[in-house]
Amino acid sequence: MGLRPAKIDRDVDKPAYTRREYIRGAPGPKITIFDMGNLSAEFEYEVSLHAEQAMQIRQNALEAIRIQVNRYLQKNVGRSNYHFKIRVYPFQVLRENPMATGRKADRYGNGMRRPFGKPIGLAARVRKDQKILTVWVNGQHLKFALGAMHRAKMKLPYSAYYRIYDKEGNDVTTKVLSTMKL
């Protein structure tokens, strides 16, 4: 069966369903790498993407964000000039009650009898204003980090915003953006 539309799974409207020891057939995570780039260097700025509201991000979207942002930064900045980290993990198990459709579906379908559903995927639950991903760069590469965040925002189910922090953790978004030429 194909992938369902993301709007079905993006709301946090059900209780958490994460206890894998009780879930038969729960799928494994597709995303396995959470830190990319130069992990040991110190950088001037931290650019983080925050959620504007609570949401669930499917593991397919997280993997697409990881590939897109990492490839963009490698191409424009170079592997040793950034550190990229995904800060959420897909714990939430998504379920689907498969409905039989078509001719003679009533013969073999269950309908709403025992409709709990079977595990079909994983998602990360994100709270409002929580950091989703972070890129550390120096001042000359800040423009590319903001471009990477813009590309990542397009793959999220709801809107998000980014913030720029200095080494001490102070929010310098307005100061930096006013001096930058985009």
UniProtKB/Swiss-Prot annotation:
Gene3D superfamilies the UniProt entry points to: Ribosomal protein L10e/L16
Pfam families with a match to the protein in the record: Ribosomal_L16
SUPFAM superfamilies: Ribosomal protein L16p/L10e
Lineage: superkingdom: Archaea
One BP annotation, GO: translation
Keywords: Ribonucleoprotein, Ribosomal protein
CDD domains named among the record's database cross-references: Ribosomal_L16_L10e
UniProt-recorded Gene Ontology molecular function terms: structural constituent of ribosome
A GO cellular component annotation in the UniProt record: cytosolic large ribosomal subunit
InterPro entries according to UniProt: Ribosomal_uL16 (IPR047873), Ribosomal_uL16_arc (IPR022981), Ribosomal_uL16_CS_euk_arc (IPR018255), Ribosomal_uL16_dom (IPR016180), Ribosomal_uL16_euk_arch (IPR001197), Ribosomal_uL16_sf (IPR036920)
Assembly information from the UniProt record: Part of the 50S ribosomal subunit.
Family the entry assigns: Belongs to the universal ribosomal protein uL16 family.
Protein name, entry field: Large ribosomal subunit protein uL16
Higher taxonomy: Archaea, Methanobacteriati, Methanobacteriota, Thermococci, Thermococcales
